[in-house]
């Protein structure tokens, strides 16, 4: 699990202005190994890219990692803003 976190961090760090704000959280569910990438709100456009191309490329790299068992890897990307309920 730590290898995938390191991979996500390594891929995203050169893209952002605020690398210290990169945070990768992990949660395991019955079907997925879920990784939640949070970046500074000013960097979200750089990580997603035009028409989501950068985000798609990051997901392709992360999804290509082999994991043992039937679970699949899932990556979500969020900015660091709090959501109002």
Curated annotation (Swiss-Prot):
Compartments it resides in: Cytoplasm
UniProt cross-references to Pfam families, sorted A to Z: KH_KhpA-B
Domain of life: Bacteria
Summary of the knockout phenotype: Cell length is reduced.
Keywords recorded for this protein, A-Z: Cell shape, Cell wall biogenesis/degradation, Cytoplasm, RNA-binding
GO MF annotations in UniProt: RNA binding
Homology family: Belongs to the KhpA RNA-binding protein family.
Protein name, entry field: RNA-binding protein KhpA
Annotated gene: khpA
